[in-house]
Regions:
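The feature captures the beta-strand-to-loop junction immediately N-terminal to the Walker
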Residues: 30-35
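Conserved ABC nucleotide-binding domain
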Residues: 97, 101-119
Length: 143
């Protein structure tokens, strides 16, 4: 479970988040809807530790959360396969080419091509594949 209590975030004098309270429970799907600039991405960046904030965000100790941000960055000299292998190693997981190939039967990505050359949609798929391979319990997906 993830619990957000009295969350506040300011950029300079501009209040972006003001007293947010939320609970996310395992096994459920949640959607966060709001106008552009409403603070959705800021909330996700607070929840994942990218931004400092005031208030509290409590996560179960064993909870593994993965975050797919709105913008993706891929090194120009790394293939889709190399990116997925890197993401698995970063989480301390053994790299299984067979598991990657099996998952790619669903996503149908050209994993031998440089990820930086992928279309925007292909980059999103690659990022989501990485989250699935990392065995996360919760997926925070921004746009």
């Amino acid at each position: 479970m993830i619990e957000v209590n009295d969350l506040h975030k300011k950029f300079g004098k501009v209040k972006v988040l003001n007293g947010i309270h939320l609970e996310y429970h395992p096994g459920k799907i949640y959607g966060l809807v709001g106008e552009n600039g409403a603070g959705k991405t800021t909330l996700f960046n607070c929840m994942t530790g990218i931004y400092d904030y005031t208030g509290s965000i409590t996560k179960s100790k064993t909870l593994k959360a993965g975050y797919l941000s709105a913008s993706n960055f891929f090194y120009s000299q790394i293939t889709g396969l190399e990116y997925l292998e890197f993401c698995m190693k970063a989480k301390g997981l053994p790299v299984s080419t067979l598991t990657i190939q099996h998952l790619n039967e669903i996503f149908q990505l050209p994993l031998d091509r440089y990820a930086a050359e992928y279309s925007t949609g292909m980059k999103k798929k690659l990022g989501f594949m990485a989250l699935l391979l990392q065995e996360n319990d919760v997926f925070i997906l921004d746009e």
